[in-house]
UniProtKB/Swiss-Prot annotation:
Protein species of origin: Syntrophotalea carbinolica (strain DSM 2380 / NBRC 103641 / GraBd1)
NCBIfam families documented for this protein: PRK00742.1, PRK12555.1
Record remark on domains: Contains a C-terminal catalytic domain, and an N-terminal region which modulates catalytic activity.
Localization (cell): Cytoplasm
Post-translational modification: Phosphorylated by CheA. Phosphorylation of the N-terminal regulatory domain activates the methylesterase activity.
Protein name: Protein-glutamate methylesterase/protein-glutamine glutaminase
Keyword flag rRNA-binding: no
Role according to the record: Involved in chemotaxis. Part of a chemotaxis signal transduction system that modulates chemotaxis in response to various stimuli. Catalyzes the demethylation of specific methylglutamate residues introduced into the chemoreceptors (methyl-accepting chemotaxis proteins or MCP) by CheR. Also mediates the irreversible deamidation of specific glutamine residues to glutamic acid.
Record: active site: 171, 197, 293
Catalyses which reaction(s): [protein]-L-glutamate 5-O-methyl ester + H2O = L-glutamyl-[protein] + methanol + H(+); L-glutaminyl-[protein] + H2O = L-glutamyl-[protein] + NH4(+)
GO biological process terms on file: chemotaxis
Length: 353
């Protein structure tokens, strides 16, 4: 019989702890080994109960979830799924939590509580099971500093790259990976389009946060936005983002639609459009994430002449999307996260005969 996933539920509300515990216990592969009302109690129970995964409330008294994560992860890295409110403050703290090492998050329902609660618990069970397979070992000890922007490569990279498009897809663990890569790009980098699996409301905050950290302009995409050097467009949650050609330039179209491979926005949708309209002028990048979204689109990009990279297993939180993309022939090579930005710049500067 397979070993059950041992979960510790951390929330300051006794009612929420009870609801989450009962919901998780309905899954035969999950065992709730304990609950904690605040991070101080949680710290002791982590040592005593040795859980495989934590669920953690975003906003708590005494110490919020982010501060707890920042203290926990360097000493005792564990996969953590955040339970978030959809308030503006809750969204901000959720993104802080992902930066601090949380694997994923679920949002508490705000309307139609009965139906919303059932959906949230189902999502929580799925994400706890995914989190149990996540690689969080790189959080052990001191966190690495984001490398300096690649200023010395800037002039060389620009030689033949003014009409290039860089298309990046990511899911679980992707926010941190994207930040590390984009923060190294110079302001004159070719246009970048990104699909990160994330609900509506979170993508705008994610873009705003990246915009404060990066030399490039970063914004949540809207239909009609031009793809141009120095700009990064993040696909909005709840909309598929497609790249189209309009005269002499590229722009994006953001449209609602059914989930593709379970996601909206979908990496496949974006990459298929890049294959069709950008072809050999594109570079594709597949980062950490569960599942296979983007693998077919990346293969189409390669067949259209694009050069593609996928994140390697050792640096992924979840080696799913990059693995499938590489195995299906979409990615030319597997690259570590630390080497990804320099490798992209190298590809931009290569002459193609």
């Amino acid at each position: 019989m397979p070993k059950k996933i041992r979960v510790l539920v951390i929330d300051d509300s006794a009612l929420v702890r009870q609801i989450l515990s009962k919901g998780l216990a309905l899954d035969p592969s999950i065992e709730v080994v304990g609950t904690a009302g605040d991070p101080y109690i949680a710290r002791d129970k982590i040592v005593k109960l040795q859980p495989d995964v934590l669920t953690l409330d975003v906003e708590m008294p005494r110490m919020d979830g982010v501060d707890f994560l920042r203290r926990l992860m360097p000493q005792y890295p564990l996969p953590v799924v955040m339970v978030s409110s959809l308030t503006q403050k809750g969204k901000q703290i959720t993104l802080d939590s992902l930066d601090a090492g949380a694997v994923d998050f679920v949002s508490k329902p705000t309307s139609d509580i009965a139906r919303g609660l059932k959906a949230m618990l189902s999502e929580l069970c799925a994400k706890v099971k995914l989190a149990s397979t996540a690689n969080v070992s790189h959080w052990k000890a001191a966190r690495t500093v984001v490398p300096a922007r690649l200023k010395t490569l800037e002039k060389r990279a620009l030689a033949e790259s003014t009409d290039k498009v860089i298309a990046i897809g990511a899911s679980t663990g992707g926010t941190e990976a994207i930040r590390k890569i984009i923060a190294q790009f110079p302001a004159t980098m070719p246009g970048v389009v990104i699909v990160q699996h994330m609900p509506a409301g979170f993508t705008r905050l994610f873009a705003e946060r990246l915009n404060q950290l990066c030399a490039m302009e970063v914004k949540e995409a809207a239909t009609g936005d031009r793809i141009m050097p120095g700009r990064v467009l993040i696909g909005p949650g709840g909309f598929h983002m497609k790249v189209v050609r309009s005269g002499g330039f590229y722009q994006v179209r953001c449209e609602p639609g059914p989930p593709v491979k379970g996601h909206c926005p979908s990496v496949d949708v974006m990459m298929h459009s890049v294959a069709k309209h950008v072809g050999g002028n594109a570079i594709g990048v597949m980062l950490t994430g569960m599942g296979s979204d983007g693998a077919e689109g990346m293969r189409a990009m390669r067949e259209a002449g694009a050069r593609n990279l996928a994140q390697d297993e050792a640096s992924c939180v979840v080696f799913g999307m990059p693995k499938v993309a590489y195995e299906m022939g979409g990615a030319h090579s597997l690259v570590s996260l630390d080497s990804m930005a320099p490798r992209i710049v190298d590809l931009l500067s290569e002459r193609r005969i």
